């Protein structure tokens, strides 16, 4: 739920009509970034607050029943279609490009996808794939590939967006300045449960190296005036899947405050 920090930033940007030409979302950034394009202020916090205690949304019951911590059908289709509708019309009319990043579990390569109208079942499946956490999600099959969380292969896709022609980029991190990633302590679990996907095991074993290199590149681009960085001042007081309403609201508020500071509002 660290992504609610991003949601807070995007809501402030919408409220103050701060427009960008494109967004690339990774993992929770894909789930929440689409709301910027559809101009739905408050939607990300609202549905997460409303659904936090609903076993149909996410939790151990879903994981045991389906192998997915986030219920694939309910969270990514029923919710945006019926319960808290995603504004498909506004998304389709927007000039803002929306891209997501996934990881091919066979090759270990990042897979980039620009999502355009119509906002249909496959559209939401790409968002699901980008945010499908390893170990607690089945790979999502799209375009002949098996896909999981994009953060495994490209956590900070700044170079990708620069190659798309975006010369100055606002980069939102959910870790504070000075953070350096260490090798995950979950490697025994990856080796035990991801044997079918050796590329994923290798990715996770060296992900900290790739991530820290991306941080160095981001710092270089920021110094050169080609990137604006927004990050929390302190470690966000919430876990990736934690569903405490109080903590979710706090993290969202921290995002809003970070945006107000970054844009001098």
Kindly give the residue locations of the regions a language model identified.
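Patatin-like phospholipase
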Residues: 1-26, 34-265
